[in-house]
């Protein structure tokens, strides 16, 4: 990308550390781990890329780099009919700004299972992340993503969920740390009766850049989506971007969708860009 493309027009490319154009030094590290003790019906393992093929397509430049560089995939699986009472904690902590980690992660919740997963991101690092989520028929998943990075972190991530028949997916994104955070929480419905809720809060202070770029693909009938993001900004050159894009395809009769973004500017010199989009095929 050059910055002239619609998907990149707000992003300060020079601050991405080369993760978008192939000039980053690729780190050989896996900073994601499962916190706490083992849980019945839940497995977390590192697989080779050939053992964990991609679950979705993406035209994002950084996702393309991740899939080129990442030789292993962290896979979390929740077995069918498992109801996990306590939240599952995934922790990512790193302290290396000299190279970039290109990370592939897959979360698979099987049919009729129910769970809450918390991803806690801390430390100072450069991270490119492709997180794919598969929500099987009748499953119910809540995913909480906490960006609590230190001041110099650059984090570019995609969080893409495929939601099947009568399944429910809730995403809660909290972004308060890092120098630059660019997240793509996206959803595609693969069968009728699916629903999603994308919620987010962010607080940017002096010099921080936070971009949250939503896309919900209503490709089947009778699916429901709710998007609600709220932000606050304080300090010179604090900058946030929210893009909310809902695509209703011709076959998606009975679609129920809603999106909202609100921002509170607490000082001069801060800027919040908000762009809602609704596309009907």
Predicted features and spans:
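Long, low-complexity, mixed-charge
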Residues: 1-57, 61-67
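Conserved beta-strand/loop scaffold segments within soluble protein domains that form the structured core
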Residues: 51-281
